[in-house]
């Protein structure tokens, strides 16, 4: 099967592209190579690479020619950046999804739209988000992803497009761009830099290893029912402050590095997914956080040549903009 993987040079997308290629599938990766896209993430993978924007209809048509399916990982994903400016999020996450839907509709091709638990918004204690829950996004990022999801739902109903949506919980693992909490805190700790913990640090996230996330998306690609939405949750809820303490232990650093800083505007307090629907199809997460987090810390410790060049230049300018006033 020939598959187009958009956003395939990013974090989750590159792991997925390599997974499909290793399974013997013919994989075409299309990626715009924005700040978080990195061709090095695909090193050694037998994939065809196309540098292009999913908003470019002609480029998408050329890359997708002959493909039996499209899996869309292409997205702007960082909440803090969306708060500073949302135009790129709207372009990629909303318009880009429309372009892909237009192509799959015309060509009778399957689409898997990779989305996020953040579209559900804040989840009260004692409950978990189900696939048919209302969407209540809290940030420009999650609103853009919800917009993409709604387009997919409408295209299935109106045009009969063959499409599924996955909504994943917070994902971690090797090759994650160091603006997200785990790689940010791990690399800062390894360098003896402050760990900027938002607010009281009691925000709760459901953690999922990237390989488990990719296994879920592959299962939906192969066996998911058209028009269905599948939550992909790791079932491991951890407060950010507890996650931070574990990172300190694993990096051999102490709590003097932790700096409680002004919270993010509109910061959701808790995410939690009910993934029983996908479990009914045959998926189960295979890697516990207690195993996956030490492996991830070890990867960043052993691969400074991957992340040190990233944490200079444009990244440093963003970091100063985001945290300099908060850190004082």
Regions found by a protein language model. Give the residues of each.
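N-terminal Rossmann-like NAD(P)+-binding domain of SDR-like oxidoreductases, especially those catalyzing
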Residues: 1-171, 295, 303, 309-328
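Residue-level recognition of oxygen-bearing side chains
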Residues: 59, 69, 88, 95, ...
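Residues that form or flank phosphate/diphosphate-binding pockets in enzymes
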Residues: 12, 37, 58, 176, ...
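Hydrophobic alpha-helix immediately C-terminal to the catalytic Tyr-X-X-X-Lys motif of short-chain
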Residues: 147, 151, 155, 185, ...
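C-terminal substrate-binding subdomain of Rossmann-fold SDR/epimerase-dehydratase oxidoreductases
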Residues: 16, 52, 183, 189-328
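Short beta-loop-alpha junction of Rossmann-like oxidoreductase domains
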Residues: 41, 123-124, 174-176, 180, ...
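The catalytic Tyr-centered alpha-helix of NAD(P)H-dependent dehydrogenases
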Residues: 137-144, 174, 178-182, 206-210
